């Protein structure tokens, strides 16, 4: 029967109608499909929600194999039976990954904090920590005096607008390669760094490379514009790498407070759309880190349950916006945060001081680089 090629009323309790025309297919609002509900479900149930969405929107079965899966990794050779664990792809020159750092440049970032015993503005601390992490990423790419292209890295600053945050020769660029970063430093500064010695941990002055600069001139915190820019960059990156088994890109958003200029629902929808983007190895990971100068406020990092947030409205908003981390991250969370609990953690931090921010950045930058490729 011709009708058996399509979803019928028996396929779902909601009573989908027969509909195999292109007009039926065009009725689907895919942004609505990427609803909060999908990400709130346990991982083992997400595929059933996906199937119900496809069926009740009258999609002809012949089209289903060509539709994005809203969260389930698609194998690079779909006609072959494969068993694949997400977030296990090796990072190589042929299968790179990407990092996007989003940095709040609003005026409140001029408040003071302490980084390794040195007083400075939160903007300066955030810039130093991001520069430190970028430098670490570049160092991971150096093999036998060769800088290998394992990563594409972008930094987006935001206040009233969102823009490329690179300085110097890279100014105005979006994604740049590790080799370009090594060859185009903006400037070098002397900072303090903890060093382990036989006498214990000591703080020494060391020279550090900078690619971005502290900025707290903005009046607003328009994170929705930063998310829009990040989505555009990732869309282009995904199109370039869609046939490869690439480790999913990571977005790390650092802010000191509430965003403004857009509703909570709108920003949450943007976050869900970013999290719904995927490679053949899994979905994009979105970290949201609330950076503070208050040592007296309890810091919350990578919680498992909302109950840990003490009914903090802002923390609960970040919880909903942030990715549910794969269990492979648990070892890093245990190492950095001394949190040995089983379960899936959220990629978030609230009231994070400079030390906690460093730890969260370390968790957010995976190290599964191939040693030979």
What are these model-derived regions, one by one?
Residues 2-78:
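Active-site-proximal loop/hinge segments that shape catalytic or ion-binding/gating pockets
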Residues 80-96, 144-148, 241-249, 258-373:
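P/S/T/G-enriched low-complexity
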Residues 101-106, 126, 230-231, 247-264:
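DG-centered beta-turn motif at the end of beta-strands
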Residues 78-122, 235-244:
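Acidic, polar low-complexity linker/tail segments
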Residues 178-246, 285-297:
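Von Willebrand factor
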Residues 109-150:
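…and closely analogous acidic/polar surface helices at protein-protein or active-site interfaces
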Residues 146-209, 297-308:
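Short beta-strand-loop
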Residues 95, 119-130, 215-230, 263, ...:
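Phosphate/oxyanion-binding active-site loops and adjacent basic polyanion-contact surfaces
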């Amino acid at each position: 029967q011709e009708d058996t090629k399509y979803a019928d009323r028996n396929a779902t309790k909601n009573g989908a109608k027969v509909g195999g025309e292109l007009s039926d297919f065009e009725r689907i609002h895919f942004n609505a499909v990427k609803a909060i509900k999908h990400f709130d479900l346990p991982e083992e149930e997400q595929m059933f929600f996906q199937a119900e969405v496809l069926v009740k929107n009258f999609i002809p079965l012949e089209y289903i194999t060509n539709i994005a899966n809203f969260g389930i990794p698609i194998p690079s050779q779909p006609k072959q039976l494969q068993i694949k664990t997400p977030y296990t792809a090796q990072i190589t020159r042929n299968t790179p990954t990407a990092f996007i750092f989003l940095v709040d440049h609003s005026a409140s970032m001029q408040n003071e904090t302490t980084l390794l015993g040195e007083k400075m503005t939160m903007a300066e601390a955030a810039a130093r920590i991001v520069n430190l992490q970028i430098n670490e990423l570049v160092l991971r790419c150096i093999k036998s005096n060769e800088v290998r292209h394992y990563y594409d890295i972008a930094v987006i600053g935001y206040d009233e607008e969102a823009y490329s945050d690179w300085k110097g020769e890279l100014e105005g660029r979006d994604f740049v390669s590790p080799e370009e970063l090594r060859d185009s430093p903006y400037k070098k500064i002397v900072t303090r760094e903890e060093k382990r010695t036989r006498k214990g941990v000591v703080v020494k002055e060391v020279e550090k490379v900078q690619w971005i600069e502290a900025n707290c001139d903005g009046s607003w915190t328009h994170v929705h514009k930063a998310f829009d820019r990040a989505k555009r960059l990732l869309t282009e990156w995904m199109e370039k790498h869609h046939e490869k088994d690439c480790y999913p890109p990571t977005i790390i958003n650092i802010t000191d407070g509430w965003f403004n200029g857009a509703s909570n629902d709108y920003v949450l929808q943007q976050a869900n759309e970013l999290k719904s983007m995927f490679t053949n190895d899994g979905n994009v990971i979105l970290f949201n880190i609330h950076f503070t100068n208050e040592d007296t406020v309890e810091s919350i990092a990578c919680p498992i349950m909302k109950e840990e947030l003490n009914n903090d409205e802002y923390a609960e908003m970040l919880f909903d916006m942030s990715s549910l981390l794969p269990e492979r991250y648990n070892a890093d969370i245990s190492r950095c945060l001394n949190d040995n609990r089983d379960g899936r953690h959220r990629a978030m931090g609230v009231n994070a001081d400079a030390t906690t921010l460093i730890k969260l950045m370390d968790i957010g930058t995976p190290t599964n680089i191939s040693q030979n490729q």
